[in-house]
Regions:
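Short, charged N-terminal beta->alpha structural module
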Residues: 47-78
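Hydrophobic membrane-insertion alpha-helices, especially the h-region
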Residues: 8-27
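Solvent-exposed, acidic/flexible segments
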Residues: 54-65, 92, 106-110, 151-158
Length: 181
């Protein structure tokens, strides 16, 4: 038989567990959510080649992005950097290549990155770096690499991404246009 004291204790335990669960969710979001990246440009405005870099803010992605931008500006290539969440409003056609650095969220690619790639079935101009907890998740049908955001591997991952990007840029310019749906 349930006494008032026993019911009270069970309710307090359940409330405590619920509170702990929500505290965990808040901690997880604060620890693992991506920062928003400020839009910026670098390189000469009259450059022969232009690259769009869409990324999310994290220490690892910032380091990889900085390496990519440094490499491109050293080659006098214009670079436009936007947050991945802005991809829906970006026209990819003026760019010779598009680099997307995104994280997997809830076992799926970042929604804006996936929607942008879905809108561009010819992905020959795209290079993607996908980060996930295990470093093994990747969007199918696009050139790129996957990483677990290990800081000690950021330079090697950036070099890998740059090598892929250089191959895209060496092929020359072809139109990058969304699918006609």
């Amino acid at each position: 038989m349930w006494t008032f004291e026993r019911m009270k204790r069970v309710i307090l335990i359940l409330l405590g567990l619920l509170l702990a669960f929500f505290a965990f969710l808040a901690w997880y979001k604060a620890t693992y959510s991506m920062d928003v990246v400020s839009e910026r440009s670098s390189g000469p405005e009259d450059a022969a080649q232009r690259v769009l870099v869409a990324t999310q803010g994290s220490t690892y992605k910032d380091l990889v992005t900085d390496h990519v931008i440094g490499h491109l500006t050293d080659q006098s290539i214009a670079v436009q950097v936007v947050d991945v969440t802005m991809l829906g409003s970006v026209d990819a056609s003026p760019f010779d290549a598009v680099v997307i650095l995104h994280t997997w969220e809830n076992w799926e690619p970042q929604p804006d990155a996936q929607a942008f790639l879905n809108a561009h079935p010819d992905r020959t101009r795209f290079v993607v770096l996908a980060t996930s907890g295990g470093g093994d998740e990747m969007i199918e049908g696009v050139d790129g690499i996957s990483s677990a955001s290990v800081m000690d591997e950021a330079q090697a991952d950036a070099d890998n991404l740059i090598a892929r990007l250089d191959r895209v840029l060496a092929r020359g310019r072809a139109p990058v246009s969304p699918s006609s749906r």
